[in-house]
């Protein structure tokens, strides 16, 4: 699981940077009470997420093994497990990136506590599903990855729902 983190982080960093820029713009527009520009910025960032997620997922899926080999991950079973984990994570990477974008939007709106709450909920979901997928179902590393993406996608969708219900822009 930890072996694939540097690759996942490297390929996700672009969206983290975009999210940071959006946070700054949203904060400026929201502070100026220009809700139309807040809305445009939020829509633009979600559009960038949707458009960019497919190429990012495909790049991550297809480069998983070559990048793990470049990192000299041993081929004693560790490589296969790390590759399985990474492929599943990249299939569901929209949850991670979507959560980060929602977090940036909320921070730009002056609400940093709600994204922390969604993160805590995702953590509880992840722990419960880790136990379910690895003990009774025995999915191993694939179960851990599946639990992670389900928790992240749930957290992202909670955020989308909250932002749409709470903020009128």
Model-based region annotation:
Residues 1-55, 96-115:
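Small-residue-rich hydrophobic transmembrane alpha-helices
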Residues 10, 126-130, 156-160:
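Hydrophobic transmembrane alpha-helices of multi-pass small-molecule transporters
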Residues 17, 58, 123-127, 153:
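Hydrophobic/small/kink-forming positions within alpha-helical transmembrane segments
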Residues 22, 63-64, 102, 129-130, ...:
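Hydrophobic/aromatic residues in alpha-helical transmembrane segments
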Residues 26-92, 138-169:
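Short alpha-helical transmembrane segments in multi-pass integral membrane proteins
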Residues 49, 105-129, 146-149:
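Alpha-helical transmembrane segments of multi-pass membrane transporters/permeases
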Residues 71, 75, 79, 89, ...:
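Cytoplasmic helix-loop-helix junction between adjacent transmembrane helices
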């Amino acid at each position: 699981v930890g072996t694939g983190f540097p690759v996942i982080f490297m390929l996700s960093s672009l969206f983290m940077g975009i999210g940071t820029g959006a946070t700054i713009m949203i904060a400026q527009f929201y502070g100026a009470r220009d809700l139309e520009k807040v809305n445009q910025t939020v829509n633009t960032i979600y559009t960038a997420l949707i458009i960019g997620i497919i190429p990012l997922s495909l790049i991550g899926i297809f480069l998983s093994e070559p990048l793990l080999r470049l990192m000299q991950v041993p081929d004693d079973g560790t490589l296969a497990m790390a590759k399985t984990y990474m492929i599943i994570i990249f299939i569901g990477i929209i949850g991670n990136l979507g959560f980060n974008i929602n977090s940036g939007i909320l921070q730009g709106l002056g609400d940093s506590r709600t994204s922390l709450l969604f993160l805590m909920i995702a953590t509880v979901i992840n722990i419960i599903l880790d136990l379910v997928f690895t003990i009774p179902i025995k999915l191993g590393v694939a179960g851990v990855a599946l639990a992670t993406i389900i928790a992240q996608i749930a957290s992202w969708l909670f955020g989308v729902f909250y932002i749409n219900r709470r903020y009128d822009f």
